[in-house]
């Protein structure tokens, strides 16, 4: 990793839930993860050991959410978590750093970034099936908010005043994922799809990192 923030957004850990003999789910923050994990004990679900994720041969279900809606919800959650931790940070300061440096926490980091982290533990030919967040009720009827209060109109207005021109690159990356809803695709093919069909987006988002990494032996 190039910075401590990288280790937050792309941690050396990965959660995949086994919900049946050959049925798996990859839970993403702000995409029903709390509801899924809170249902595990009552439903007898278990986490797949990280060393076994690459052994999964059946498609892994990934629930996706509207990128803009999830960003608002994720920033709201991040702010409330900081407040609960007792950090003496005012909201204006935190929002400034989010607007300036974007992704400081996984709750509002792009869903595509979550897929990249899954790819680190899976195989290139691991299959993922994308489903809309509304279909999570097929697995659990629990709607757990993790004690997070809904976003206020005031906070939503502040976030909507961000410099969206840069942020929209990443939200569009998630929109590419939403276009795959209802489909099953290999992780490697998903990344190749972005590189081939959205080459400008791929270069703007990933080329700076690749350019730095290429100098390493």
Regions inferred by a protein language model and the residue ranges of each:
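Juxtamembrane luminal stem/stalk of type II transmembrane Golgi/ER carbohydrate-processing enzymes
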Residues: 1-21, 184-217
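PAPS-dependent sulfotransferase catalytic domain
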Residues: 8-16, 48-64, 68-161, 169-172, ...
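Short hydrophobic beta-strand segments
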Residues: 17-29, 127-128
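Catalytic nucleophile-elbow at a beta strand-turn-alpha helix junction centered on a G-D-S/GDSL motif
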Residues: 27-40, 65-69
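Short coil/turn segments at secondary-structure boundaries
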Residues: 38-42, 75-76
């Amino acid at each position: 990793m190039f910075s401590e923030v990288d280790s937050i957004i792309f941690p050396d850990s990965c959660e995949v839930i086994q919900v049946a003999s050959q049925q798996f789910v990859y839970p993403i923050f702000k995409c029903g993860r709390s509801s899924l994990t809170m249902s595990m004990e009552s439903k007898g679900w278990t986490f797949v050991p990280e060393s076994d994720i690459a052994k999964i041969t059946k498609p892994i279900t990934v629930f996706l959410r509207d990128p803009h809606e999830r960003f608002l919800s994720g920033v709201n959650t991040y702010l409330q978590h900081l407040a609960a931790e007792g950090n003496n940070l005012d909201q204006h300061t935190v929002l400034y750093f989010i607007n300036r440096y974007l992704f400081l926490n996984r709750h509002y980091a792009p869903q595509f970034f979550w897929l990249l982290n899954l790819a680190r533990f899976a195989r290139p030919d691991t299959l993922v099936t994308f489903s809309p967040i509304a279909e999570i009720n097929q697995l659990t009827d629990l709607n757990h908010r993790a004690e997070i209060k809904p976003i206020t109109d005031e906070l939503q207005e502040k976030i909507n005043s961000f410099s969206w021109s840069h942020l929209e690159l990443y939200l569009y990356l998630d929109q590419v994922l939403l276009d795959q809803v209802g489909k099953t695709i290999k992780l490697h093919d998903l990344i190749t799809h972005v590189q081939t069909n959205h080459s400008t987006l791929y270069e703007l988002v990933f080329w700076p990192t690749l350019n730095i990494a290429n100098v390493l032996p």
